């Protein structure tokens, strides 16, 4: 038995050395089945655990080169370098940073002041509930006293809803003619008919009919002279211009029959 052990000793030492080398290189040793029961496997495991931190350089395989990226590929630009803020800060001189900080502080202060002003203005705009305002609201507003001219204006509007025609100066003989026609036949020569005929307002006809005042013979003579002078003056002025004045149809009328004839002739035309 001793002879056989001696013969196998050099072979055993060579296999152990090769196994240790493979363990150091990181490859698992392919030990024969006879050494599985031996303690060499345990020693190899211990040696791998002890020497695992010290990695030995191994040449990469061809598959690594085929799958790996190209070595000279351009590196992606960082977001900081590409951002405009980074470029602006990089190009700025050193003194501008302090100025920017001061301006930022000034903006913050101005914003705070503006917010405080707006809050004050809102508070000032809020209506204050005071006793004076409540008393004013509770008291009913008294109607204003109208002036005399306002009262008269309202009365005229009520009396003449269609409007007020200004007074027209009529000849004294015309006033007598209006009264005479109305006395002859009030139904035919009514107030609207007389107003349409003499081109005055119905209110003026009513006043003429109601008035009972008659001038004295002396006043009537003076009035006729005055009106004759006025007529001549107007006639002369218009004749100088070259326009013949229109003489009204009722100037010399004193009878109702004449007016009736003229009305019939106008209606037939």
Curated annotation (Swiss-Prot):
GO cellular component: mitochondrion; nucleus
UniProt-listed InterPro entries: NGRN/Rrg9
Entry keyword annotation includes Secreted: no
Domain of life: Eukaryota
One Pfam family, short name: Neugrin
Biased segments, Basic and acidic residues type: 99-110, 135-147
Composition bias type Polar residues, residue spans: 76-91
Disordered as annotated region, ranges: 73-171
Record key words, sorted: Mitochondrion, Transit peptide
Family recorded in the similarity comment: Belongs to the RRG9 family.
Protein name, as recorded: Required for respiratory growth protein 9, mitochondrial
Species per Swiss-Prot/TrEMBL record: Ajellomyces dermatitidis (strain ER-3 / ATCC MYA-2586)
């Amino acid at each position: 038995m001793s002879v056989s052990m001696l013969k196998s000793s050099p072979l055993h030492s060579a296999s152990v050395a090769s196994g240790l080398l493979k363990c150091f290189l990181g490859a698992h040793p392919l030990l024969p089945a006879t050494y599985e029961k031996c303690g060499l496997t345990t020693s190899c495991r211990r040696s791998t655990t002890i020497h695992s931190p010290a990695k030995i350089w191994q040449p990469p395989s061809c598959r690594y080169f085929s799958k790996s990226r190209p070595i000279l590929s351009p590196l992606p630009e960082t977001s900081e370098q590409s951002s405009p803020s980074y470029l602006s800060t990089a190009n700025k001189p050193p003194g501008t940073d302090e100025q920017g900080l001061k301006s930022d502080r000034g903006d913050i202060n101005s914003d705070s002041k503006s917010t405080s002003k707006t809050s004050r203005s809102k508070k000032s705009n809020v209506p204050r509930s005071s006793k004076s305002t409540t008393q004013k609201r509770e008291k009913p507003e008294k109607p204003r006293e109208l002036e005399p001219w306002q009262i008269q204006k309202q009365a005229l509007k009520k009396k003449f809803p269609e409007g007020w025609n200004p007074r027209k100066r009529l000849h004294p003989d015309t006033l007598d003619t209006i009264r005479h026609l109305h006395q002859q036949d009030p139904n035919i020569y009514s107030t609207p008919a007389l107003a349409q005929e003499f081109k005055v307002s119905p209110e003026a006809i009513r006043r003429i009919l109601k008035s009972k005042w008659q001038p004295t013979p002396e006043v009537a003579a003076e009035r006729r002279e005055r009106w004759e002078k006025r007529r001549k003056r107007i006639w002369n002025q218009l004749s100088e211009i070259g326009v013949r004045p229109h003489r009204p149809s009722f100037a010399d009328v004193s009878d109702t029959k004449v007016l009736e004839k003229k009305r019939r002739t106008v209606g037939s035309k």
